[in-house]
C-alpha cells in the first residue's frame, strides 16, 4: 500500500511556541489544532498528551523529529515546534535546527513575564526571528482588568527592550485550556464561543502578521542533518530542515561528514509521515538514503548536491560579543580562547587564533571585550563543510556569548 502523499497547496511556514515553563505553550498548541479541526481547516488535532508523550519518547530515543506538529489554517500550512521540556530546546533554537519563521510568545496572565520568558525572547532575537505574536494566556484566571493592563504594559516594555516593536507586535488575550474545555462541551460547532474565537483570532493574526519567508529555491540543495534513524529493511533516514534548493526522488546527493564525504541517492522523501515527490527549502523532511548505515551519519553532518561544498577547519569571521545585559560574558577573552561554535546543526570546539579590527587586519587586538564588533581567525577541532556568509553562534557554559558570520575561508 503506497504512502499518502503530501499535498502542497498552501504556503509552508515554520512557527513555534516560546515562553516560560507552565505558561501553557503545549496546551495552546493543542488548542490551535483542535480549533482548526473544528473549523474544518485541518484533519488532525493533538491532545496535550499527544504532544507531551512525543517529548518523552524523544528523551528515550524512540522516535525522531517529534517536535513538529502539523496543521493548516485558512491560508497556510504550518510546521509548529512545541518542545518546551525537550533537553535540546535551547540548543536547537540557537543552532537553527528548528529555525522558526515566526513565533508565538506565551505569557500567563497569572504571572506576567518570567525569567524563561526573557530567555526565550532573547534567543528568538539572537536566531533572527523578526516577528512574533504574544498570547496572554489563562485570562479566565484573572478578573481584574488593572492586572491585565499592567501585564500588557510590562510585556510591551520587555518587547521593546529586546528589539521587538511593541507598537506593532500583536497582544492577544485568551485561555487555551478554556478553549479546549469548550470544544469538548459543544453539541454543535460554535466558532463564536468566547474562548474559541480568541484562539481563532490568534491564528488569523499569525496568518497576517508573520510574513511568509523568502525560500532559497534556486541555490544548490543543502540540508543540515538534525537526526537520523534506521528502518529495518529500508535503510537510514536523515531528518532536518532544507536550507537551500530542491531535492527530488532518485536525486544523487553527497553526505558530508568530518573531512570526508560519501555519494548516495534519495530513495524516499517524507514530511509528517506523508510522501513527497520533492522537498523544498524550508521543509522539515526525512530523506531515505540508499546504502547508508546509521553509523555513517551524525547530527551536524550535511546532505547536499554532489561536489557543491568543500571542507575547511580555519576561517575568518566578524564577531559580535554579547554584553552581560544581552546574556553574554561579563569579562573579555583573549587569543587561545576555546568556546563551542554552533554552525547549522553542529556544535564543535574551536580556538580563537587571532583578533583584529574590522577595518584593518594589521591592527591586532589582545582582548575581545563584551560589546565589541571585531574580526577573528578561528580554527576548528575538525574539518567541516563551510561557506562564506554562513552565520554561527558562540557558546560557553550553557549560554550564548557571541554571534558571527564567516567572511573568508582559510584552509
Swiss-Prot record:
It is an enzyme of class 3 (hydrolase). One of its GO terms (cellular component) is apicoplast. InterPro entries: EF-Tu_GTP-bd (IPR041709), EF-Tu_GTPase (IPR050055), EFTu-like_2 (IPR004161), EFTU_2 (IPR033720), G_TR_CS (IPR031157), P-loop_NTPase (IPR027417), Small_GTP-bd (IPR005225), T_Tr_GTP-bd_dom (IPR000795). GTP binds at residues 19-26, 82-86, 137-140. Residues 82-85 are annotated as: G3. GO terms for biological process: mitochondrial translational elongation. Its EC number is 3.6.5.3. SUPFAM superfamilies: EF-Tu/eEF-1alpha/eIF2-gamma C-terminal domain (SSF50465), P-loop containing nucleoside triphosphate hydrolases (SSF52540), Translation proteins (SSF50447). It is found in: Plastid, Apicoplast. Mg(2+) binds at residue 26. Keywords: Apicoplast, Elongation factor, GTP-binding, Hydrolase, Magnesium, Metal-binding, Nucleotide-binding, Plastid, Protein biosynthesis. Residues 61-65 are annotated as: G2. It comes from the Eukaryota. One of its GO terms (molecular function) is translation elongation factor activity. It catalyses: GTP + H2O = GDP + phosphate + H(+). Residues 175-177 are annotated as: G5. Pfam families: GTP_EFTU, GTP_EFTU_D2, GTP_EFTU_D3. Belongs to the TRAFAC class translation factor GTPase superfamily. Classic translation factor GTPase family. EF-Tu/EF-1A subfamily. GTP hydrolase that promotes the GTP-dependent binding of aminoacyl-tRNA to the A-site of ribosomes during protein biosynthesis. This is Elongation factor Tu, apicoplast. It comes from Theileria parva (East coast fever infection agent). The lineage of its organism: Eukaryota, Sar, Alveolata, Apicomplexa, Aconoidasida. The gene is tufA.
